Amino acid sequence: MAALICFLLAGMILRFPGTTISASQTALSIWAQDIVPSLFPYMVLCKMTAQRLRSTRFPAAPLAALLGCMGGSPSGAAMLSVSSGGMAQSQLYALCALTGTISPMFFVGTLHAWGVAQKTCLCLLAAHGLGALLSFACVWQLSPAKGKVAMLETPEKANGNPIADSVFSVLGVGGCIVFFSVTAACIRVLFPFLPENGCAYLQSVLEIAGGMRLLIQTSGASFARDVSMAVLTGFGGLSILTQNHLFLQVCGVTQGRLLCLALLRALMSGAVMALLLWLI
């Protein structure tokens, strides 16, 4: 099935090269102008911090949680891929729920640069973090404590050059943004009757950065839009799930498991955002 979808997508790219090029240019512009300036220096700092803490034999689980919450995806997933050996599966799944987040700089930096009010950005960041924490607690309590995760990666892979590793991580983010932006553009060609808001939500499910920018451009500030943004960023988009799975597949974490955790995180983030907006 996946191969068939890839062939169909390749056919559409060849059939509509103008649409593909335009979507790629837009995605690369978002990545280069809005994502890299905020994400890259922050990711370097997070990796340097993690390296320092790792050298002091800081416990693996708290370190993965700290790095994931500080740096967002795929930093936490990368850390889990090299430090999950010996963890209980319930602990690994709970940490996947906690660390499958978006960088805090996306909320206070990128979204604010796109015109979202600072107060709303801070509420979105709070809802995102609390939603991940609530998801962590739920998974920790409800997941059966089965076996332990085998060590499938060597810790040396986590001890590279922080700057070089960050470059490749940011390039991976850019590749996923472009791929899923092109996918969203091809779907819009197939269904031209979709309204602009519908296209924004669709693209957000596939690729969060471009989708959020389109949603901000096509809708004004409102309770419904802000809660929707919390839900969508809590989910993270298939782009982020793909990036995380590239690291976590060596731990035996399936895409279906990551999808379920993302849906739980989206539900929690949306509920917290609605509560915050109601309180303030």
Model-identified regions with their sequence ranges:
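Small-residue-rich segments of transmembrane alpha-helices in multi-pass membrane proteins
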Residues: 7-8, 34-40, 100-104, 155, ...
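Membrane-core helix-loop-helix motifs of multi-pass transport proteins
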Residues: 86-140, 248-271
